UniProtKB/Swiss-Prot annotation:
Name of this protein: Fumarate hydratase class II
Keyword Cytoplasm belongs to the record: yes
Molecular function in Gene Ontology: fumarate hydratase activity
Lineage: Bacteria, Pseudomonadati, Pseudomonadota, Alphaproteobacteria, Rickettsiales
Complex formation: Homotetramer.
Residue positions binding substrate: 98-100, 129-132, 139-141, 187, 319, 324-326
Organism in which the protein naturally occurs: Rickettsia felis (strain ATCC VR-1525 / URRWXCal2) (Rickettsia azadi)
Sequence segments annotated as region (Disordered): 120-140
Amino acid sequence: MKNYRTESDSFGEIQIEEKFYWGAQTQRSLENFKIGKQKMPEILIRALAILKKCAAQVNYEFGDLEAKIATSIDKATDRILEGEFEDNFPLVVWQTGSGTQTNMNMNEVIASIANEELTSKKGGKSPVHPNDHVNKGQSSNDSFPTAMHIATVLATKQQLIPALNNLLTSLQDKSKDWDKIIKIGRTHLQDATPLTLKQEFSGYITQIEYALERIEDALKKVYLLAQGGTAVGTAINSKIGFDIKFAEKVAEFTKQPFKTAPNKFESLAAHDALVEFSGTLNTIAVSLMKIANDIRLLGSGPRCGLGELHLPENEPGSSIMPGKVNPTQVEALTMVCSQVMGNHVTVTIAGSNGHLELNVFKPVIIYNILQSIELLSDSVNSFVTHCVKGLEPNIARINDLRDKSLMLVTALNPHIGYDNAAKIAKEAHKHGITLKEAAKKLNLLSEEEFDKIVVPEKMIG
């Protein structure tokens, strides 16, 4: 049999199961928004706990919280950050667009934990009040966007950047000895002039290097925090200097360069910084899609495709075709990239709907951004472990395709002209003979002249 306690808010009393620490507003949200199962991301909850910890410290230093209250809030946030109350943050993304109910969920749980410590009884509003103490000098309108920025930075630094560095290092290590492997290039999915396998992979390496640079550039605005703007950006009910001191506390706690936003009206009404950051995630997805698809194409086969790369064989690929092995890591990564691109569309639409003084698409913005970060991070690490590290060049196939390519004829342009070189290529293709044989047949070059000019090793820059 479940036990219940009575909590109350401005709408009256409501029953809450005794084992939970949340209060009336959280319970109402649970009952009013039974929409989907997409809960607020755990790292956003952590960001809110960090926010409340730092706010309580500043309020104490400003003389607005007595020591007992501030200390109890501080201890409660520590316990939340240690993961002790994970089941007490049950709200879904599909709620008020300001994130008010999740902000109050955090306020109520912190107050309840603190009150249990001070009175041996959870819940209630005394001696620690969720609004008057935990939320002091704050509004959901500045607290939730602040938590959005903190969560984005933490997820990026803890998950995405390490994953991309892992991929970068693996690509560099894998390709460093491939500078002598000369293969045929392809443009428009047609044969082109030669390059080395290392040169081909250097393009992928640079894409990832640029991705890391883009992240750092896009984070510059995400480091700016809305806290202190309160309801509409005017800082009503917040003391002068609270915003600056708060940002310093968050920076100190997280070891990240957070600062107070210079214009709080922009920070509440718009989320351009996060839309821009989502655009960076979208660009990274574009880069990864290209890299993964190239590796898939180069590894196609084993007998009837390009077959220039051997991809690791991780599991059976077909329920009907015995012995078939598929590029499953590539498929997983490219599906993630598709999801991230879709997430960016959602973030773009949500960001464009910041009406007047408050954008009320905040939960869906941060949900999609954090999902994109998580999916990209996990899929990249999986791709590295189960694909990139096991890539091996198929030297025999690479040499065979290179030597058969008609586009080696490009080396003849400076010597016999474009038109004559084209005649050789067409003649070779039409009759299924080599370029050398076609050049001799057309009386344009001797075998000796051809061998002196058409040297793949001299065509790679």
